């Protein structure tokens, strides 16, 4: 675990009960918010007390995926702007037992670019929520605000669809998150500068991989390498392949796990996949949550399997 000077914890603190999950994706349009809503519903159906947080600051739409007729009057923006003091006070009922929603902060300009002290306050209060699972739906891309939400999670999940752009962006997200985590663990400015330089593929230090980075740090500060290795070992993202249309799409998750091990030196897990079904999007247009409408459908069953795999930290067998 490490903390920045501003007080932001960049790795999760062990808990006996509550878990923070985050659902990210390197690009938009991959069904991430709908998957977050579906997972939240499934977890609540399993008896978990769940708060969904729409952390797509500036582009909140999780309320629509849940079938709410209108955006909630109270949002994360009210907490950020200190209109309320407790983050619990902006959590609203969804109509599903055990599932509440903290809607995103798209109700004021600049929500996506909150200041560092505001971010620290939000993240630290999220850690104190009294529920079984906090499930955060993150925005797309690799902005630091998005990555910092991902890094405080106990379970960080990357959603991909079986398309080259989505796969490339997911890999880029994981690499950026890893380097952001390592920078948070660095204790000297020289080491921080080396890590920051590594984000530029054309950096003067010739750093292309985390192994190159560790070698560069060892030359500068040999005593810092062990702590960075521990951070790398503790970083464990999960992958979910969404909108699967055929058997050939399923191995994409295994390919990402292999790429992370080979090129980034980290352990990751392929947690599961969800098939595409046009009926899902028809439900969205009618403001209905598909998994609640058709719990016996293939996508709903796969979401249930995914929830169990994430709870148990299980990986999809290579035979898939």
Protein language model features and the residues they cover:
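Acidic-aromatic/histidine active-site loop/patch
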Residues: 1-20, 307, 312-320
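Walker A/P-loop NTP-binding active-site region of P-loop NTPases
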Residues: 19-87, 133, 146
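P-loop/Walker-type NTP enzyme "switch/lid" segment
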Residues: 55-132, 188, 196-208, 218-222, ...
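Conserved ATPase-coupling elements of RecA-like P-loop NTPase cores
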Residues: 112, 138, 142-149
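Inter-motif core of Ras-like GTPase G domains
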Residues: 127, 145-165
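NTP-binding/hydrolysis catalytic cores, primarily Walker-type P-loop NTPases
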Residues: 266-267, 281-320
